[in-house]
């Protein structure tokens, strides 16, 4: 069991230079794409956080478990409340639309919480099932209309829904850029859900095989015209959960594991009709994503 308290963590995002033409472009995009404009602004993040980690297997991490075990990870953090209170005392009435600042630098204000649970079921010494659920929610308020870019959630990739490349899924049913390319700025959200079940088997030497099914997506808390279809709604979100399946190889080097995964899209929430279910008529060039990861 491990507890960690971060009393003060300071992060300053500084843009050294923006040309006047680029600044005019960002200003023109502020209504259509607020996420893009916010990503190129100076910002101070002063956060306080607490995290809790527990593994029933003790010091042995769940990389290649040898018995039934489970792990829990929880984290909560907040940023900007003390700075906001101090700014209210010094400058109680800023002009309409202006942020509170510290030394002329806007600061972020938000609260964020994450929870992860993983359970390992041993079938025999060579075979096991692992179930994982991860949930995260972050809410910007007060001095922030949007989370700092590095605090937003992303979906797809080796540790998420593996039928999609990293940061290429969501939010919701957002389709990405008009030209079909990945849109890292807008394909981010304030809410994240990841579900995973994986069958693992020892092959030979230090190699293990895996077969998996992943599900999940991300969503935004506030409606944004630049992320159309990304808003979280209780009566809609379950229809927007993406599903993937695939196979993987694990090279267990004791001190770390090399993971190689190939995922295929099974349910694509962005599409409609028959295209929504690529599992029925899979197309390798369209539905496949390869992932490599190192687990320490």
Describe the residue ranges of each PLM region.
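Outer-membrane beta-barrel "beta-signal"
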Residues: 251-256, 282-296
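C-terminal outer-membrane beta-barrel translocator/porin domains of Gram-negative envelope proteins
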Residues: 1-201, 211-234
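Strand-connecting loop/turn motifs
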Residues: 67-69, 124-128, 204-206, 253-257, ...
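Short glycine-rich, acidic/polar surface loops and turns
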Residues: 196-198, 242-250
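Short beta-alpha connecting loops at secondary-structure transitions
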Residues: 98-99, 149-150, 229-234, 241-243, ...
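C-terminal beta-signal and adjacent terminal beta-strands/loops
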Residues: 215-232, 255, 263-281, 296
